[in-house]
Amino acid sequence: MANYTKTTIGKENRIELHEKLSLTDAEISLNELPAGANVPFVHSHKENEEIYGILSGNGKAIIDGEEISLSTGDWLKIAPAAKRQFFASDISGITYICIQVKENSLEHFTAEDAVIG
């Protein structure tokens, strides 16, 4: 049995990779909002922090009532309890990756966990 899982994804507005890659400790989704669209709900989490990377486009996030502008290349970490909602700009859509992991669960960073050779 291989020590990896590979998948190919199509063009969808939201793709969750936990099932496609058999993820055990992370949720990763690829998301695309067309111009003028938004995530239709405000949400927070019980234990999981979220890391967002803006792959293309422009928009904004409202986090605990604060409006944050987003554009290609921006990265954002949001604590579990923060209430959040995402919006594409009226002119262009926004494509982003969301990585969700349990807050404070990482015990070792790459250099400490790597086995060379």
Regions found by a protein language model. Name each.
Residues 1-26, 41, 107-117:
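A short, N-terminal "cap"/entry segment at the start of jelly-roll beta-barrel domains
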Residues 22, 47, 91-92:
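Short strand-connecting beta-turns/loops that link adjacent beta-strands
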Residues 24, 62-66:
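Short strand-coil-strand connectors
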Residues 24, 34-38, 58, 102-105:
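Short, charged/polar surface micro-motifs in flexible loops or helix N-caps
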Residues 32-33, 44-62:
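Short, conserved beta-strand element in jelly-roll/cupin
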Residues 38-39, 60, 76, 80-86:
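Histidine-centered metal-chelating micro-motifs
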Residues 65-80:
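Short acidic-glycine-tyrosine-enriched beta hairpin
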Residues 80-106:
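Ligand-binding loop in jelly-roll beta-barrel domains
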